[in-house]
Amino acid sequence: MESQQLSQHPHISHGSACASVTSKEVHTNQDPLDVSASKTEECEKASTKANSQQTTTPASSAVPENPHHASPQPASVPPPQNGPYPQQCMMTQNQANPSGWSFYGHPSMIPYTPYQMSPMYFPPGPQSQFPQYPSSVGTPLSTPSPESGNTFTDSSSADSDMTSTKKYVRPPPMLTSPNDFPNWVKTYIKFLQNSNLGGIIPTVNGKPVRQITDDELTFLYNTFQIFAPSQFLPTWVKDILSVDYTDIMKILSKSIEKMQSDTQEANDIVTLANLQYNGSTPADAFETKVTNIIDRLNNNGIHINNKVACQLIMRGLSGEYKFLRYTRHRHLNMTVAELFLDIHAIYEEQQGSRNSKPNYRRNLSDEKNDSRSYTNTTKPKVIARNPQKTNNSKSKTARAHNVSTSNNSPSTDNDSISKSTTEPIQLNNKHDLHLGQELTESTVNHTNHSDDELPGHLLLDSGASRTLIRSAHHIHSASSNPDINVVDAQKRNIPINAIGDLQFHFQDNTKTSIKVLHTPNIAYDLLSLNELAAVDITACFTKNVLERSDGTVLAPIVKYGDFYWVSKKYLLPSNISVPTINNVHTSESTRKYPYPFIHRMLAHANAQTIRYSLKNNTITYFNESDVDWSSAIDYQCPDCLIGKSTKHRHIKGSRLKYQNSYEPFQYLHTDIFGPVHNLPNSAPSYFISFTDETTKFRWVYPLHDRREDSILDVFTTILAFIKNQFQASVLVIQMDRGSEYTNRTLHKFLEKNGITPCYTTTADSRAHGVAERLNRTLLDDCRTQLQCSGLPNHLWFSAIEFSTIVRNSLASPKSKKSARQHAGLAGLDISTLLPFGQPVIVNDHNPNSKIHPRGIPGYALHPSRNSYGYIIYLPSLKKTVDTTNYVILQGKESRLDQFNYDALTFDEDLNRLTASYHSFIASNEIQESNDLNIESDHDFQSDIELHPEQPRNVLSKAVSPTDSTPPSTHTEDSKRVSKTNIRAPREVDPNISESNILPSKKRSSTPQISNIESTGSGGMHKLNVPLLAPMSQSNTHESSHASKSKDFRHSDSYSENETNHTNVPISSTGGTNNKTVPQISDQETEKRIIHRSPSIDASPPENNSSHNIVPIKTPTTVSEQNTEESIIADLPLPDLPPESPTEFPDPFKELPPINSRQTNSSLGGIGDSNAYTTINSKKRSLEDNETEIKVSRDTWNTKNMRSLEPPRSKKRIHLIAAVKAVKSIKPIRTTLRYDEAITYNKDIKEKEKYIEAYHKEVNQLLKMKTWDTDEYYDRKEIDPKRVINSMFIFNKKRDGTHKARFVARGDIQHPDTYDSGMQSNTVHHYALMTSLSLALDNNYYITQLDISSAYLYADIKEELYIRPPPHLGMNDKLIRLKKSLYGLKQSGANWYETIKSYLIQQCGMEEVRGWSCVFKNSQVTICLFVDDMVLFSKNLNSNKRIIEKLKMQYDTKIINLGESDEEIQYDILGLEIKYQRGKYMKLGMENSLTEKIPKLNVPLNPKGRKLSAPGQPGLYIDQDELEIDEDEYKEKVHEMQKLIGLASYVGYKFRFDLLYYINTLAQHILFPSRQVLDMTYELIQFMWDTRDKQLIWHKNKPTKPDNKLVAISDASYGNQPYYKSQIGNIFLLNGKVIGGKSTKASLTCTSTTEAEIHAVSEAIPLLNNLSHLVQELNKKPIIKGLLTDSRSTISIIKSTNEEKFRNRFFGTKAMRLRDEVSGNNLYVYYIETKKNIADVMTKPLPIKTFKLLTNKWIH
């Protein structure tokens, strides 16, 4: 390819400014990927070899014969010497000419690449005749140059370089960052000097020594372009080039000027680093000198922090000032000003008395609180004061020196230890000092002896873990450079020179030795009491002696000052000389790691974090001083700019201009909060808030939904309010970009009223801070108020309203006024305010009886908007009323006592506070107030209607069964009511809502859900009122709902034999919610029953039998009875609690029905299948009932409930009809292309792994002879339809391996190139589950295999061609395929036929009829899934024999042989299986879900409350038309595809309990409304919360040697849109769930019986097929059973009368069902609905029911 490239540029000379020294010829078809680690290694070896040679060779000897290839150098010519740099490109010096120029001297050839020919490296106009430098030449800028000398020289030095001797010239490094340009220019100037171009370099006056020629200018331009890419140039350089792209001389001139300007900075740094002060000059002059230097450096951008400045100053102090050197050990945060205070104090004492020793102290408190310092010892400190704690208490000395040591820590660089510590640091320029980093301990000048040291003694240290001494004369058996790290109290390293033994010879002539470390960098010789204790020596500070544990005195302890010392006379001297120990390497490398390198090495952390980590030794191996921090401040990492992109920062106080530009109420902020779930429908789910920018006045309005008309009503209201009340006109309203604000309706309204909408920018919620903060504040207040008062959650908006009133009246700390005052309103009269939730007694002006009490307990909420009254909540009436007729309830029974607030709130104070308000009402009260109205006009919170599914416990302890008191009155006197029944009036059940309709007891952090069935976001509640509902044609109405009536005691069921009530399920028509209908008279009911259609006579009464299981036939033999019991015995059916009779008191009958529309559901198209009503007469037929919507509206009109909104008619539309302008949805791509994985992959490690996988795949393709390598075809000669595009795809597997696959583009394959009749088969999941189940029951061994590159073993019949892989470099050629390449349409079928033939002919297997990819013989069963095989056998040797045969033909890998008797873990087709033979098998996907779900970008809540069920029952999905643009629609559909795709994969693998929810949501993939997405998120959240759940199987222990195959069936009638029914089936083998199915019925059923028949008919075919599979795999007899909870279906199957079906449209299906049951020897039995586990397949269930039906088989 190189030759082709060069031939296209004949005008380019083959000479080059770079000479190649590689010794291998570059071939045109070489794989570019091979230029990797191995090639670099060869170059480095060549470079190393070059460095060892000392001779050079003329350039002419390197000229190759072939101008297109780099020839190897002659063996006699040694490669050039040029230091440690790679030798890919060198430059030679040929007298006075630039090296490598073809017409100046001999050219030096280099291999060319297309990158060199890029036009970007040539100036416009005529092309330069000089060759360009390749991008790979040069060395990284971070590589230190070995050349010494000045960065630039004058002409004389340049001329001196012009010698006749040729030498090789190293090119400059590549510029990699704009911050590195100053350093790069120096190396570039050096390069020009070495290239005999020193005369053209501008001097200090800006002019060159000689005039530059055109050829030299071209050379200058080309080399500058090569080694200084435009993207890395500083801005000022780009500005020069933008004017004249060839003006390199101006760039060099300005660079030299900048170097000169840095001289003053360098001088200041050198001066600061070499300060000396001993008091000979005034302290003021010294301070002025230092501060001036620091100020100049700071002004020039070189920041000198206090810590560095203090260290530099203290290092130069001497004489009486030297003790201040160690002040930094006491004061870590000392400033320069504080240090000079100490210097001034000593200087003044010096001047006052020259002969007195200074005893200056900064502060006495410092002496008490800080570690021991190195000051003089006027008042020395005590090291160990407590004799009892000498061994474990850390002394101050320890904190000042060595807090901890570690033998595993990397040793510090000891090169600097042997240097003189008193020698000042000499700096040549400012780059020698890296400012901002802390000086290490080794650079601090330590004196040999401190002033407070006792000479000839060792200081006893109770806190030091090691003994340290400064002299080496007492160290025995010393070894240099120990791998020990010792740090002082400030976590600084103390360099250690050697380690050895310290030997003692005590008074009792005993000798003892301990380990000792040698370092000259400490102030005292420290003797560790911890190490002495290790050799049985302790210090007794009461006797002042060292002694053994037996009391033997070894040596005296001397107290000098506050320290304790031991004489060195007890130490034995050694024969080791000091130079031996101190012989440490002194050649410290000056190379520093560049900050960009460290930045990338440490995961792109910021400089401050990296420096802090190095300073605190959290990162080891190198220190802070080893890094070049000069570019850290200005360095911009492009990866960080992209990966860490953030929103713009909002300027504090930026809204002041709005406050100055607008008058009050002209600029509003608004936002919507919601929805709040699990509330009654009368309670608002949202609220919208408004805030005035100038006055900060707030308004809040409740919302039940976010429809356009609802929002528009609120905007109309507030604009009229502001206009009329404040005589102002709103000019601007700021809001976010929610659809409720951006719709056309509101936009036209604002435009009509002349209001400017101000929207926030995309994803910039902070710009909407005013409204967002208000909502957050109000919600905080709401939660607090509800928690304090104990009121139920459905009163949440009342708490918001109360908070808004109060906060409008509170003064702002900033403006000193309240919002009401800014608005010109009077302050809030607190006497009119009651605490939120204050218990009160409200007068009932219209009781049901004159003898009933007139007082009703209630709870004060907030002042009324519409009157002078107060909004009060009456739990007994489930109302809020607006009234002034109330009395504050006094006594200890107030709701505050449950929070122990009695000490904070007092009734006396409350009465005194509200006295004036109540006296005003009393004095102006003329007649009894009649404002207590049950149908209150309060527009937002009256008639608190409970959720229709909420449970009602009318038999609470407060109500007796015989109590007939109406619900609105009380039977006890007011005193008892106020004292005992304030929280729970007898007529109301305290458990009536999720959070309790009355104030609860003190709420715990974990919500109690013992009697409340709800999901994490709500759940399903039971009915609280008697309801009527239409029924089906069948008088028996056998459905999946039939036995699921709920006891009002929260029992699962009740017996109808003990009551006069009949259970009637509320059907869900057309997918709408369940509408209740009013009670009707018995007479009317009987009238409607007369016109009822006749039912099937064969249907027996459903509730006459008390048996749970009813067979299709009456057992006539013991065998049949045993069969029934055997089928039921092993099934994982729930254990039900014992039933109890339920009685219904009279008050329950008198409660009126309440109807309202439903809120959004968690799963759509679902009616309340678990809600039941009671009537006193017979059932009614479905045909005679009006539609639910009509009845509900009539009920609403009849009851005249003005405060309730009637149910809205939902417009049902077809899902596809709602999709507008949908073209195609792109499939989800999880793989990477070649350019993503390799070419542009910035992750080097991952790139290398993909490259390795690439070569592995290519080698495998060649090994398998995938294509014909003997002949290449021209593309023009081949029919285009036979040419298949190919590509490499890359992906990372679950086990962490990186995979590359060369595939064909089968998606665009022409139909003529394959046989469409061929099929690619894989094992059915039911077959795999059946095989696994049989393996568990029969103690089989399970072996898992994998066949590498399986498709490539199959030959291809068709004539097909593909393009060669990229590494061959033949884009215009084609190769003919010989094997079935992955991706071809026919590859799967070809492989299936190949492996099938081999297994049958060579392995003696046969394929099970009807179950593809399941093979068996007498000993082994094989399940095949493409290239994965699972073998089952009783004898492991049988599996091994099959494996040996497979290995003879295929590359077979054993993934898991399965020979262990312990638990074995498999990963089979995505299932994570734990199997212990003969005991159990667990199937799950925890690891897979843990990895995949977080990648879906679903807002998970890992720390919050876990969901207990995947959805809520009883609600529906709104089907209003979507108003959404096409791009957003496609994005949401794509998101739904990902979420539902993963959920389906998991559900059909083993989470059969989720199939209903998955199937329902899958029907709405093309209808991605906000509600549907929320439901999907809820499902994914439940999967995340239960990702550890497993399908549990236990080995079957049968009573008979039979296999039992059972299908459990269920159906939900008409609960899907368009009256479609949901059907579900679960299949079990020997009591183990092996599969499940949930789907919407294809036909519209007209009754529950027909729906059940449809479900059973769907189950029987698969049941028969599974029966055949089980019999083929295991020769035992098989019993087939089918269970259903529909007695009507069983009766139809049982009946032999055909006449009754002739006029039935489901008669044909029923007759066929009879034939299938009788012809397949199928047993059909009745199962009670409460035990029907298939119920989870047809409808959403309450938590309790859901858990009850699933916890036996999945947990």
From Swiss-Prot:
Residues recorded with modification Phosphoserine: 416
CDD domains recorded: RNase_HI_RT_Ty1
Residue ranges occupied by any Integrase catalytic domain in the UniProt entry: 660-835
Single annotated GO MF: RNA binding
InterPro entries cross-referenced by the UniProt entry: Aspartic_peptidase_AS (IPR001969), DNA/RNA_pol_sf (IPR043502), Integrase_cat-core (IPR001584), Retrotran_Ty1/copia-like (IPR039537), RNaseH-like_sf (IPR012337), RNaseH_sf (IPR036397), RVT_2 (IPR013103), TYA (IPR015820)
GO terms for biological process, alphabetical: DNA integration; DNA recombination; proteolysis; transposition; viral translational frameshifting
Region span, Integrase-type zinc finger-like: 583-640
Region listing for Disordered, in residue ranges: 1-93, 126-173, 352-421, 956-1087, 1092-1111, 1130-1187
Compositional bias of kind Polar residues: 1-10, 48-60, 127-152, 1005-1015, 1054-1082, 1101-1111
Record's comment on post-translational modification: Initially, virus-like particles (VLPs) are composed of the structural unprocessed proteins Gag and Gag-Pol, and also contain the host initiator methionine tRNA (tRNA(i)-Met) which serves as a primer for minus-strand DNA synthesis, and a dimer of genomic Ty RNA. Processing of the polyproteins occurs within the particle and proceeds by an ordered pathway, called maturation. First, the protease (PR) is released by autocatalytic cleavage of the Gag-Pol polyprotein yielding capsid protein p45 and a Pol-p154 precursor protein.
Residues annotated as domain Reverse transcriptase Ty1/copia-type: 1338-1476
Description of how the protein assembles with itself and partners: The capsid protein forms a homotrimer, from which the VLPs are assembled. The protease is a homodimer, whose active site consists of two apposed aspartic acid residues.
Name of the protein described by the UniProt record: Transposon Ty1-LR4 Gag-Pol polyprotein
Name of the gene this protein is made from: TY1B-LR4
